[in-house]
Structure formats: C-alpha cells, structure tokens
Curated annotation (Swiss-Prot):
Stretches for region Disordered: 385-405
Family, similarity comment: Belongs to the nucleotide-sugar transporter family. CMP-Sialate:CMP antiporter (TC 2.A.7.12) subfamily.
Job of this protein: Sugar transporter involved in the transport of CMP-sialic acid from the cytoplasm into the Golgi.
Subcellular location: Golgi apparatus membrane
Lumenal side: 61-73, 164-170, 221-243, 302-321
Main location, first listed in the record: Golgi
Protein name as it appears in the record: CMP-sialic acid transporter 3
Disulfide cysteine pairs (residue numbers): none
Naturally occurring in which organism (per UniProt): Arabidopsis thaliana (Mouse-ear cress)
C-alpha cells in the first residue's frame, strides 16, 4: 500500500484502502463525483451563508441602545436554540413521513436512544457555541461590525491547525501560505490606532479587546472542528436528528447561563423577553438560520469552506455598516479584503492541493480507468468478470467518511 492506495494481488488494480488516514474521504473523494445540481446547491449555500453571516453584526449593532444592550445576550442565544430545536423537530417529522417501507423508523424510542448515545459528543461543541455566542455580543462593545468580521477570519488558521490534529487533514505549502496571506489581509485592515478610553466593564480598551479576541478566535474554532468530527463520525444518522441533539444541548447550556444570571443579578433578570425589540427578533431568526446552514457545511463539506464562505461576508458587512451607520470604509479595509480574496483563490486552487491528495486522486482515476477497461473485457468473458467482481467484495462504501481511528 502506498499513499493510501492498495493494489489488488489478483488483477493489480488500484483501490482506496479503507484504513488510510492521509486524506479524509469526507473532504476529497466525494468531490470527484459531485453532480451539477449539487454544485448549484453548494453555491446557493455559500451565498446564503454570506448574507446571513454578514447581516449578523449589523443586526447586533442595531440592537444596541446608547452603546449598550437593554436585553440579556444569553436570552437571545437561548431563544435562538429554541428556534433551531423547533426547526429540527419539524424537519424530522417531515423526513419520517417520507421514509420508505422497511427502513428503520426515525421516531422510534430505540432509534432515538441509540442515536443519543452515539452523538453524545455533540455536547462539547454545544457548550463551546454557547460561550462563543455570548462573546459575539461582547466583541461589539470593542469594534465596529466590519472589524468584528475581519477578526473572526483569524479562526481559519486555528481551524486549520485543529483539523490537522483532530481530523488528520493535510495541507500543502501553498495552502499554508494562503492562510498566512489571510492573516496579512486581516492585519492590513487593523493598521490604525485603537480609540482611547475605558469600556463599560472597566477594563482598558486595548487589554479587553486583545483578551476577547483570543477567546473569540479559539473557542469557536474548537467548536467548529469538534462539531464537524461529531457529525461526520455518525454519518449515517439523520442530520436533523443530530441537530436536535446539538440544539437541545445548546438550549440547556444557555438556560443554565440564564439561571446563573438570575443568581448574580436577582429574579428580575429571569424575564428572557425583557428589552427585546424588532431588531433582536430578526437577530434571533438570523442566528437560527445561520446555525442550521452551518450544520450542512460541517457534515457534507468542511469547516475551511465554511470559514472562507464567512470571509466573503466581510464585504457585505462593511458596505451595510457604512450605509446604515455611517462607518467609513478605509483604504486599509479595501486592501485587506483584496488580500483575503487572493488567499481564498490560492487556497482552493487545484495546484494548491497536498501532494498526497493529488497522487491519491490520480491513482484513483487510474484505477477507475483500469476497472472500466477490465469490465469491458469481462463482457466477452462473463466468467472472468464474475470472478473479478467477487475479488472486490471487500471495498469500502464510498458514502462512509474516512475519519481518524
């Protein structure tokens, strides 16, 4: 076996080894057989993600009154999780009604209990997301919406490191250089002095901003990678059932946060609807739609694509914040965005793929060509074709994602 490709001793054809850990099939192998309809769907998902992610900082900014929030950010996160739970239940009911005869019922108690046990790892990203969602509001106290989006792009580098460690994904030198370009683009946008003064919580602005930035980058990066790992490790489980567990855990953690606020501030803070406005209602719907869309990225695509998709939303955020709130679009911002787009093009370029990935895809296509030629010969000799088919009964299912073991 070489580079994850095994050679059949009987016919010397190339086959993907089910034990290979170099490249995850969830990332690469499915892209070879992507249909035109799925490509269109992926484009629509990216466009929708850009709009939702780009609109979120604007809605958060609109929710502030005199630079402060009259509502509890935890209450917004809790209502968002409740909205996503309702969506998951509705979609699960619809999926159950369209099940074929003989399939294991999705709504049976045994199926639910078994799926809950298999997907208990989703509690980890749910907790991290609960922390991150609160940090999104805190970051708005330090930066304008466009800057928040630029800072969030720092997550890509942290995610890449975590993917290499957790998912065993390999990146080429060109892809690492693309990530470095991304950091340069973000830095160019930040080449201006921070305003002086103190924040509402009494911490010097520079210190508070740096601390929040480190947490704001690290926590959601870990949440995204662990979420992707948990979703892909139970690939055969319905995504709506997995989302039900993920959002259920999230609602529990946010409710515990509300109880903690009640203990700290008193019973008056238990009113989760206090201080909400029309802008916060749109914010809740936007956050819910964004979370639902993210789950499809994590299960059927990958986290890097999701984060680069969110990067494109920076343009929308910058233009919207300038039009609605009068924020100035600086030359640094335009230069930073240009560098970010160059980075994105370089990262996803076919020439930037890791050498092992190129060899695997080339060997896989060569193996498929040999198999096709051999199948044509077996049409003449049916007995030989039957023997050859029997020799490959052990090949793994292409639908099963290859995760580190």
């Amino acid at each position: 076996m070489k580079n994850g490709i095994a050679e059949c001793p009987a016919c010397h054809s190339k086959l993907v080894s089910p034990g290979s850990k170099t490249i995850s099939r969830a990332y690469d192998d499915h892209k070879i057989r992507v249909s035109s309809k799925q490509r269109v769907l992926n484009v629509l998902l990216v466009v929708g993600d850009c709009m939702l992610v780009g609109l979120q900082p604007v809605l958060v900014y609109m929710s502030k009154v005199d630079g402060k929030f009259n509502f509890s950010p935890i209450s917004v996160n809790f209502l968002t999780e409740i909205a996503k739970v309702i969506f998951a239940i509705v979609m699960l009911l619809i999926q159950a009604r369209h099940q074929k005869v003989g399939e294991k019922p999705l709504l049976s108690v045994s199926t639910f209990v078994q799926a809950a046990r298999n997907n208990v790892l989703l509690a980890v990203p749910a907790l991290l997301y609960a922390i991150n969602n609160y940090l999104k509001f805190t970051m708005q106290l330090y930066f304008n919406p466009a800057t928040v989006k630029m800072l969030s792009n720092l997550k890509v580098l942290v995610i890449a490191v975590l993917l290499k460690m957790v998912m065993k994904r390999r990146f080429s030198i060109i892809q690492w250089e693309a990530l470095a370009l991304l950091l340069i683009g973000i830095s160019v946008n930040q080449l201006r002095s921070l305003p002086e003064g103190a924040t509402a919580i009494g911490i010097p602005l520079a210190t508070g901003a740096y601390v929040c930035t480190v947490i704001f980058v690290t926590v959601p990066s870990m949440a995204s990678v662990f979420n992707e790992y948990a979703l892909k490790s139970q690939y055969d489980t319905s995504i709506y059932l997995q989302n039900l567990f993920l959002y259920g855990y999230g609602a529990i953690f946010n409710f515990l946060g509300i109880l903690g606020t009640v203990i700290y501030k008193g019973p008056g803070s238990f009113d989760i609807l206090q201080g909400h406005s029309r802008a916060t209602m749109f914010l809740i719907l936007n956050n819910a739609a964004q979370g639902i869309l993210s789950s499809f990225f994590f299960k059927y695509a990958d986290t890097i694509l999701k984060k680069y998709s969110s990067t494109v939303a920076t343009i929308f955020t910058g233009i919207a914040s300038a039009a609605l709130f009068g924020h100035v679009i600086t030359m640094n911002f335009l230069l930073g965005i240009s560098i970010v787009f160059i980075s994105m093009h370089q990262f996803f370029s076919p020439l930037a793929k890791a050498r092992d990935e190129q060899q695997q895809n080339g060997n896989l296509e060569l193996g498929n060509t040999k198999d096709t030629h051999r199948a044509n010969e077996s049409f003449i000799n049916m007995a030989a074709g039957a023997n050859e088919e029997a020799s490959h009964r052990g090949e793994s299912d292409d639908r099963t994602p290859l995760l580190p073991r």
